[in-house]
């Protein structure tokens, strides 16, 4: 019963559950005198105006959802910053919506910098005591809303990100450093709002949903600002020598001082409206209705993708699965087969010296397949790992899937060599003609990654 079709359909249910347009639409309600956004109420007057500012992988669809609910008479301006590869999905956005693109392959570029300057200019132009700035924020926002602090330039910031990613930095570590190299991240965007108020509807792509780190927290005033000791600890934990960093970056981080930020008043509100948990619940509901004993194990899976892949292989080959590393602290009780184990979160990849092409989900599944070369499955299984944004690393694949039927073919390609070369994409492209790739195209959102493991008795 552990079938690929069930797993693929369950992943599709994940994507439907976190569809940004409907999520934003459900978060906003309007009557003649009252605007309700998430859990916050605004009394409307004849002078009330709303400026919608959306940035991130879900920005276009989130903007559509907001405009579905808001009267045109209230809307002063809508400005959207979307990933370059999403050009063409902006249909149904009205002509008065300004859409800017940037951050191809999820890295900041000069287009991102230009778009950020445009956002700052619009905030300054429309700021008034009767203005509500509605921010729609999603994963990828860090790359799209970019304004390096002087004297840094974009190339220096990019080099810093590259170094950190090569050392396996988590999104939390990356965004903490980004905040300290930026004029808009870490609540600094709010410095531009002198009179109006802001509310942010946020789709989380960070484990644990820390609102101050999602998209590097441009609309969130930190409860405690980082000091240079926190920054040093991050670099030391990643084994990054400061001498590896560009000189200007090193100087900015070493001379870090507390920022002058607005007081954290009721003028600035932030609400998380979607996360990895929403996707996992949808998959669990579908699989339960399909006859599986379904369990959400965690939405906080982290660590090295290749090592996690080996741990999934351990579950597959253990008769008593609850003794495996990934499950031993889960309080999981297995009563009846078939079972569905669901995981969510975000892992990292340590790149080889001359890396090929790949992503953490493809690497995790490849590592699992490679580990099964020397171990015998104790169950019929199907295992999928895929990113909800549809883009695993700088590739056109969301992830990969394997099951028992793939094991006899495992010797046809040298999976270990592809792993060592950080070249998981090309392995899956060649393996069975690409049949094991998960190809969804860009989903228009991002709530991190999903792992689904179906197990049945042999």
From Swiss-Prot:
Cellular component annotations (GO), alphabetically ordered: cytoplasm
InterPro entries: GK-like_C_sf, GK_N_sf, MOFRL, MOFRL_assoc_dom, MOFRL_protein
Pfam name, any one: MOFRL
Membrane-spanning segments: none
GO molecular-function terms, A-Z: glycerate kinase activity
Family (UniProt): Belongs to the glycerate kinase type-2 family.
Protein name, UniProt field: Uncharacterized protein C13B9.2
Native source organism of the sequence: Caenorhabditis elegans
Lineage: Eukaryota, Metazoa, Ecdysozoa, Nematoda, Chromadorea
